[in-house]
Protein backbone atom coordinates (compact mmCIF):
# COMPACT_ATOMS: atom_id res chain seq x y z
CA UNK A 1 0.00 0.00 0.00
CA UNK A 2 2.95 2.24 -0.69
CA UNK A 3 3.30 2.03 -4.49
CA UNK A 4 6.36 3.66 -6.01
CA UNK A 5 6.50 5.65 -9.27
CA UNK A 6 7.91 3.62 -12.16
CA UNK A 7 8.60 3.75 -15.89
CA UNK A 8 7.02 1.06 -18.06
CA UNK A 9 8.69 0.57 -21.43
CA UNK A 10 7.27 -2.77 -22.58
CA UNK A 11 3.84 -4.35 -22.79
CA UNK A 12 5.06 -7.15 -20.55
CA UNK A 13 6.15 -4.73 -17.82
CA UNK A 14 2.68 -3.16 -17.71
CA UNK A 15 1.47 -6.25 -15.86
CA UNK A 16 3.05 -4.62 -12.80
CA UNK A 17 1.18 -1.34 -13.32
CA UNK A 18 -0.93 -0.21 -10.37
CA UNK A 19 -2.97 2.97 -9.98
CA UNK A 20 -5.35 3.24 -7.06
CA UNK A 21 -6.18 5.39 -4.07
CA UNK A 22 -2.74 4.83 -2.54
CA UNK A 23 -0.93 6.30 -5.57
CA UNK A 24 -0.39 9.75 -4.11
CA UNK A 25 2.92 10.62 -5.76
CA UNK A 26 3.14 13.74 -7.92
CA UNK A 27 4.52 12.34 -11.19
CA UNK A 28 5.20 15.69 -12.86
CA UNK A 29 8.85 15.83 -11.76
CA UNK A 30 9.56 12.44 -13.32
CA UNK A 31 8.68 13.98 -16.67
CA UNK A 32 11.89 16.04 -16.58
CA UNK A 33 13.92 12.92 -17.39
CA UNK A 34 11.14 11.44 -19.52
CA UNK A 35 11.28 14.52 -21.76
CA UNK A 36 14.81 13.51 -22.74
CA UNK A 37 13.65 10.15 -24.12
CA UNK A 38 12.62 9.47 -27.70
CA UNK A 39 8.90 9.61 -28.38
CA UNK A 40 6.09 10.46 -25.99
CA UNK A 41 5.63 9.32 -22.41
CA UNK A 42 2.14 8.70 -21.07
CA UNK A 43 1.77 10.04 -17.54
CA UNK A 44 -1.13 9.91 -15.08
CA UNK A 45 -1.65 13.22 -13.27
CA UNK A 46 -4.05 14.13 -10.51
CA UNK A 47 -5.60 17.62 -10.58
CA UNK A 48 -3.02 18.98 -8.11
CA UNK A 49 -0.16 17.47 -10.14
CA UNK A 50 -1.10 19.54 -13.18
CA UNK A 51 -0.18 22.77 -11.38
CA UNK A 52 3.36 21.42 -10.97
CA UNK A 53 3.51 20.24 -14.57
CA UNK A 54 2.48 23.69 -15.83
CA UNK A 55 5.15 25.31 -13.66
CA UNK A 56 7.79 22.99 -15.11
CA UNK A 57 6.66 23.93 -18.62
CA UNK A 58 7.10 27.63 -17.75
CA UNK A 59 10.62 26.89 -16.54
CA UNK A 60 11.42 24.89 -19.71
CA UNK A 61 12.19 21.81 -17.63
CA UNK A 62 9.68 19.56 -19.42
CA UNK A 63 8.69 19.33 -23.07
CA UNK A 64 4.90 19.45 -23.45
CA UNK A 65 5.12 17.69 -26.80
CA UNK A 66 6.85 14.71 -25.17
CA UNK A 67 3.97 14.04 -22.77
CA UNK A 68 0.57 12.44 -23.23
CA UNK A 69 -1.26 13.43 -20.07
CA UNK A 70 -4.02 11.27 -18.63
CA UNK A 71 -5.92 13.42 -16.16
CA UNK A 72 -7.08 10.97 -13.50
CA UNK A 73 -10.10 11.81 -11.38
CA UNK A 74 -9.35 12.13 -7.68
CA UNK A 75 -11.44 11.67 -4.55
CA UNK A 76 -8.47 12.06 -2.22
CA UNK A 77 -5.37 9.91 -1.85
CA UNK A 78 -4.95 7.41 0.95
CA UNK A 79 -2.27 7.07 3.60
CA UNK A 80 -1.67 3.57 4.97
CA UNK A 81 -0.24 5.11 8.15
CA UNK A 82 -3.56 6.87 8.82
CA UNK A 83 -5.25 3.47 8.69
CA UNK A 84 -2.69 1.96 11.06
CA UNK A 85 -3.14 4.89 13.45
CA UNK A 86 -6.73 3.77 14.00
CA UNK A 87 -5.31 0.69 15.74
CA UNK A 88 -5.82 -1.76 12.88
CA UNK A 89 -3.06 -4.37 12.73
CA UNK A 90 -2.24 -7.38 10.57
CA UNK A 91 -3.63 -5.86 7.36
CA UNK A 92 -3.88 -8.37 4.51
CA UNK A 93 -6.14 -6.57 2.03
CA UNK A 94 -7.95 -3.26 1.57
CA UNK A 95 -11.09 -2.93 -0.55
CA UNK A 96 -12.57 0.35 -1.75
CA UNK A 97 -9.32 2.02 -2.81
CA UNK A 98 -9.77 1.40 -6.54
CA UNK A 99 -10.19 4.61 -8.55
CA UNK A 100 -13.47 3.36 -10.04
CA UNK A 101 -14.85 2.65 -6.57
CA UNK A 102 -17.01 5.41 -5.06
CA UNK A 103 -17.52 3.87 -1.62
CA UNK A 104 -17.26 6.18 1.40
CA UNK A 105 -15.89 3.34 3.52
CA UNK A 106 -12.80 1.17 3.16
CA UNK A 107 -13.06 -2.50 4.06
CA UNK A 108 -9.84 -3.67 5.67
CA UNK A 109 -9.13 -7.40 5.83
CA UNK A 110 -6.83 -8.35 8.70
CA UNK A 111 -5.45 -11.45 10.37
CA UNK A 112 -8.00 -10.80 13.12
CA UNK A 113 -11.08 -10.22 11.00
CA UNK A 114 -12.69 -7.51 8.91
CA UNK A 115 -12.52 -3.84 9.89
CA UNK A 116 -13.89 -0.66 8.30
CA UNK A 117 -12.46 2.85 8.03
CA UNK A 118 -14.09 5.98 6.64
CA UNK A 119 -12.36 6.95 3.38
CA UNK A 120 -11.96 10.57 4.49
CA UNK A 121 -10.28 9.49 7.74
CA UNK A 122 -7.62 7.61 5.76
CA UNK A 123 -6.75 10.44 3.36
CA UNK A 124 -3.40 12.22 3.20
CA UNK A 125 -3.45 15.43 5.24
CA UNK A 126 -2.99 17.56 2.12
CA UNK A 127 -6.24 16.24 0.64
CA UNK A 128 -8.23 17.85 3.47
CA UNK A 129 -7.06 21.26 2.22
CA UNK A 130 -7.30 20.44 -1.50
CA UNK A 131 -7.32 23.53 -3.71
CA UNK A 132 -9.52 22.05 -6.42
CA UNK A 133 -10.39 19.06 -8.59
CA UNK A 134 -9.94 20.73 -11.98
CA UNK A 135 -7.14 19.45 -14.23
CA UNK A 136 -5.24 22.46 -15.57
CA UNK A 137 -3.67 20.53 -18.43
CA UNK A 138 -4.47 17.14 -19.99
CA UNK A 139 -4.89 15.19 -23.21
CA UNK A 140 -7.53 12.82 -21.90
CA UNK A 141 -9.61 12.58 -18.74
CA UNK A 142 -10.63 9.38 -16.97
CA UNK A 143 -12.49 8.75 -13.73
CA UNK A 144 -14.57 11.07 -11.59
CA UNK A 145 -13.31 13.53 -9.00
CA UNK A 146 -14.91 14.32 -5.68
CA UNK A 147 -14.43 17.34 -3.45
CA UNK A 148 -12.38 16.52 -0.35
CA UNK A 149 -11.66 19.92 1.20
CA UNK A 150 -13.01 20.03 4.74
CA UNK A 151 -10.42 22.21 6.50
CA UNK A 152 -9.12 25.79 6.26
CA UNK A 153 -6.05 25.95 4.02
CA UNK A 154 -4.62 28.89 5.95
CA UNK A 155 -5.46 27.90 9.53
CA UNK A 156 -1.84 26.99 10.31
CA UNK A 157 -0.57 30.18 8.65
CA UNK A 158 -2.89 32.26 10.82
CA UNK A 159 -1.68 30.37 13.91
CA UNK A 160 1.97 31.16 13.09
CA UNK A 161 1.22 34.80 12.24
CA UNK A 162 -0.39 35.23 15.66
CA UNK A 163 2.83 34.18 17.40
CA UNK A 164 5.41 36.59 18.78
CA UNK A 165 8.84 36.56 17.04
CA UNK A 166 10.24 34.52 19.93
CA UNK A 167 7.41 31.99 19.77
CA UNK A 168 7.74 31.73 16.01
CA UNK A 169 11.49 31.10 16.22
CA UNK A 170 10.93 28.40 18.85
CA UNK A 171 8.21 26.82 16.70
CA UNK A 172 10.38 26.54 13.61
CA UNK A 173 13.42 25.45 15.59
CA UNK A 174 11.39 22.62 17.11
CA UNK A 175 10.01 21.58 13.72
CA UNK A 176 13.39 21.65 11.99
CA UNK A 177 15.10 19.78 14.84
CA UNK A 178 13.29 16.64 13.61
CA UNK A 179 15.11 16.75 10.26
CA UNK A 180 17.58 13.93 9.57
CA UNK A 181 18.70 15.46 6.25
CA UNK A 182 17.59 12.50 4.15
CA UNK A 183 16.92 14.91 1.24
CA UNK A 184 13.58 13.23 0.50
CA UNK A 185 11.79 16.61 0.35
CA UNK A 186 14.31 18.00 -2.10
CA UNK A 187 14.34 14.90 -4.27
CA UNK A 188 10.56 14.76 -4.64
CA UNK A 189 9.89 18.50 -4.99
CA UNK A 190 8.95 19.57 -8.56
CA UNK A 191 10.32 23.06 -7.80
CA UNK A 192 13.73 21.58 -6.91
CA UNK A 193 14.88 20.73 -10.40
CA UNK A 194 18.28 22.41 -10.74
CA UNK A 195 20.75 20.43 -12.84
CA UNK A 196 23.31 20.85 -10.06
CA UNK A 197 22.07 21.30 -6.50
CA UNK A 198 23.93 23.42 -3.95
CA UNK A 199 23.25 20.76 -1.32
CA UNK A 200 25.31 18.23 -3.24
CA UNK A 201 28.42 20.35 -2.76
CA UNK A 202 30.81 19.45 0.05
CA UNK A 203 31.82 23.12 0.42
CA UNK A 204 28.84 23.96 2.61
CA UNK A 205 27.99 22.72 6.10
CA UNK A 206 24.35 22.79 5.00
CA UNK A 207 25.18 19.98 2.59
CA UNK A 208 25.92 17.62 5.47
CA UNK A 209 23.43 15.60 7.48
CA UNK A 210 22.25 17.20 10.72
CA UNK A 211 23.71 15.80 13.92
CA UNK A 212 22.72 18.58 16.32
CA UNK A 213 20.22 21.40 16.69
CA UNK A 214 22.54 24.17 15.47
CA UNK A 215 21.03 26.94 13.38
CA UNK A 216 23.64 26.48 10.66
CA UNK A 217 22.55 22.92 9.97
CA UNK A 218 18.97 24.14 9.53
CA UNK A 219 20.12 26.41 6.71
CA UNK A 220 19.09 23.54 4.44
CA UNK A 221 15.45 24.47 4.96
CA UNK A 222 16.05 28.23 4.85
CA UNK A 223 17.85 27.93 1.50
CA UNK A 224 15.23 25.57 0.10
CA UNK A 225 12.43 27.94 1.13
CA UNK A 226 14.10 30.83 -0.69
CA UNK A 227 14.81 28.70 -3.76
CA UNK A 228 11.20 27.56 -4.22
CA UNK A 229 9.45 30.75 -3.08
CA UNK A 230 7.06 31.88 -5.80
CA UNK A 231 7.36 28.55 -7.61
CA UNK A 232 5.90 26.12 -5.08
CA UNK A 233 2.51 24.80 -6.23
CA UNK A 234 1.57 23.47 -2.78
CA UNK A 235 1.46 19.86 -4.00
CA UNK A 236 2.32 18.58 -0.51
CA UNK A 237 4.91 16.03 -1.66
CA UNK A 238 7.50 17.26 0.85
CA UNK A 239 5.17 16.46 3.75
CA UNK A 240 4.14 13.12 2.25
CA UNK A 241 7.67 11.75 1.95
CA UNK A 242 9.18 13.20 5.14
CA UNK A 243 10.02 10.38 7.57
Please place each PLM-identified region on the residue numbering.
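Ferredoxin-type iron-sulfur electron-transfer modules in oxidoreductases and energy-metabolism complexes
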Residues: 148-177, 191-243
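Iron-sulfur-associated redox domains of electron-transfer enzymes in respiratory
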Residues: 1-172
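Generic marker of "main functional regions" within proteins
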Residues: 63-67, 79-82, 137-140, 186-195, ...
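Local cysteine-cluster metal-coordination motifs and their immediate loop/turn environment
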Residues: 46-51, 124-134, 177-196, 230-243
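Homeobox/homeodomain signature
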Residues: 117-120, 187, 222
Amino acid sequence: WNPEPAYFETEESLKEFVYDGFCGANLSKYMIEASKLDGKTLVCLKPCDTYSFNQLIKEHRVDREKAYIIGVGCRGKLDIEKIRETGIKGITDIKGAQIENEADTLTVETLYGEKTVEYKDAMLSRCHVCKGKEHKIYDELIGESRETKDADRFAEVEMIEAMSPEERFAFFRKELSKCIRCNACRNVCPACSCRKCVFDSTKFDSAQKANSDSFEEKMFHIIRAFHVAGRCTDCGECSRVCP
